[in-house]
């Protein structure tokens, strides 16, 4: 340099003061998620967490996820308050299907230019998701990276660790022909299929804020946060013998249900057992999407599927309904012939 100008990190696009302001803004909501096992608070180089003493042979279960291009829709509509709930839901729902109780959560927030209000709104949503699932928000990383993201665009990722008793891991190995499948209703598309959602909005020239479905805007339907099933599922596991649980995320019915089925087993789904929520019917019609593609891309109103002995199915529906879930018998497990599909959806 020839002009002897003294440059700062802020001149390069990184505002340390804004980052510190964000930490101060979120301390209160983060504290509300605290669990007794957590040692220390925000600000350490690492977060410390003891294992709950009730576990005899504790097995740690971990998962990481994002919210896909639902985030792009949220940014376009300038609605950042619930995307954090989505982030937590995508992680903790993946843990609980194996019988695990979520313990702690960490987030990663990356942006080109840190907007403290936006980031605080997102992290407040993360804290809300942690409260809903009973896990502690123990830390995170806020990365301001000029040149990597356009303007104040941002991305988020989450990481969660849970614990399950070794003898109580749910891995699908007990699934047998005759088991009944119980569905748990979804709150909407959750956090999957949004690249197709956005394509449909584009080709149909639809403004989601000016389109109404069943008394609320299409934008509200599409940004409805992913349902967190942790407390309902953990309660169910304590009371009934559960053979398998599938979280219907990317890949829909066709790819997620087989993940928990042993070889030689087939899930036979009764499509007449439920009605698609209006948002899915709208997406199918507006995008001229085939039935097969709908079930491969979206949850179509089913957030989770539980497999359990037939004699327990009615009780499961009763318990889940009492927990506030919409639950119903959606199908059965059958023996599959060699080479047969592992999921059959009968109209």
Swiss-Prot record:
Pfam families: AIRS, AIRS_C. It is found in: Cytoplasm. Disulfide bonds: none annotated. Pathway: Purine metabolism; IMP biosynthesis via de novo pathway; 5-amino-1-(5-phospho-D-ribosyl)imidazole from N(2)-formyl-N(1)-(5-phospho-D-ribosyl)glycinamide: step 2/2. Keywords: ATP-binding, Cytoplasm, Ligase, Nucleotide-binding, Purine biosynthesis. Belongs to the AIR synthase family. PANTHER family: TRIFUNCTIONAL PURINE BIOSYNTHETIC PROTEIN ADENOSINE-3, TRIFUNCTIONAL PURINE BIOSYNTHETIC PROTEIN ADENOSINE-3-RELATED. This is Phosphoribosylformylglycinamidine cyclo-ligase. It comes from Yersinia pestis. The gene is purM.
């Amino acid at each position: 340099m020839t002009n002897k100008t003294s440059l700062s990190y802020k001149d390069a696009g990184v505002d340390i003061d804004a980052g510190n302001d964000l930490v101060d803004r979120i301390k209160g909501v983060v504290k509300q998620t605290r669990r007794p096992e957590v040692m220390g608070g925000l600000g350490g180089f690492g977060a410390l967490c003891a294992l709950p003493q009730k576990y005899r042979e504790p097995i740690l279960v971990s998962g990481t996820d994002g919210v896909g291009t639902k985030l792009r829709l949220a940014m376009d509509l300038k609605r950042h308050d619930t995307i954090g709930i989505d982030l937590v839901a995508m992680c903790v729902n993946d843990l609980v299907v194996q019988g695990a109780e979520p313990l702690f959560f960490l987030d990663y927030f990356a942006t080109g230019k840190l907007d403290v209000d936006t980031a605080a709104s997102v992290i407040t949503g993360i804290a809300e998701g942690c409260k809903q699932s009973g896990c502690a928000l123990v830390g995170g990383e806020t990365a301001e990276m000029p040149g990597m993201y356009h303007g104040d665009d941002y991305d988020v990722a989450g990481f969660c660790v849970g614990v399950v008793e070794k003898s109580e891991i749910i891995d699908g190995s007990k699934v047998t022909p005759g088991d009944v499948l119980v569905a748990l209703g979804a709150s909407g598309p959750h956090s999957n299929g949004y690249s197709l959602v956005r394509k449909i909005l584009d080709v149909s020239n639809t403004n989601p804020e000016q389109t109404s479905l069943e008394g609320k805007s299409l934008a509200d339907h599409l940004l409805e946060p992913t349902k967190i099933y942790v407390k309902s599922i953990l309660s169910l596991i304590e009371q009934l013998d559960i053979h398998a649980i599938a979280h219907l995320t990317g890949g829909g019915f066709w790819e997620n249900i087989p993940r928990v089925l042993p070889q030689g087993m087939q899930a036979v789904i009764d499509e007449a057992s439920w009605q698609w929520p209006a948002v899915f019917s709208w997406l199918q019609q507006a995008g001229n999407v085939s039935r097969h593609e709908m079930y491969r891309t979206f949850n179509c109103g089913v957030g989770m599927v539980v497999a359990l002995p037939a004699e327990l199915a009615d009780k499961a529906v009763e318990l889940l309904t009492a927990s506030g879930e919409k639950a119903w018998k959606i199908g059965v497990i059958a023996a599959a012939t060699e080479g047969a599909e592992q999921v059959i959806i009968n109209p």
